[in-house]
Amino acid sequence: MKVLKFGGTSVGSAQRMKEVAKLITDGERKIVVLSAMSGTTNTLVEISDYLYKKNPEGANEIINKLESKYRQHIDELFATPEYKQKGLELIKSHFDYIRSYTKDLFTLFEEKVVLAQGELISTAMMNYYLQECGVKSVLLPALEYMRTDKNAEPDPVYIKAVSYTHLRAHETAANLV
């Protein structure tokens, strides 16, 4: 089974996501790994900086701008009302989650959670797009199988075991995103 990784520029717009979808839907089973859409991680770092400086108003302003950008991507990516709605609900959920960190203490742990949202959003968007196109795909959120050890290094034994379980559970899917 192939593992294909696409960086932020490759999935930086709705059109680019559609092009990636064409590349990965060749009928061969594969795992697809996506970065956050171009510019997203930098913006999430900016949001985190505002939160470290205890400036929730500044953070919320940037969050709102990024959410608006994603709403536009949803509108451009999906053709059907059903998937546009799913996409909008996805965006709302993630951005509400990011906003929840503007109300409380912000530490390195919270920063890592905020920074992970870009990849989580792009992979979920791609999975919905593939489903809308009739491609059998399954979303495997990295947070379900990634774990670090006491030194904050990846725990390869755990990751391998849980990843294998996920792969076996979804043997009939053409693409695992």
Where are these predicted regions, by residue range?
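Nucleotide/pyrophosphate-binding catalytic subdomain
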Residues: 1-177
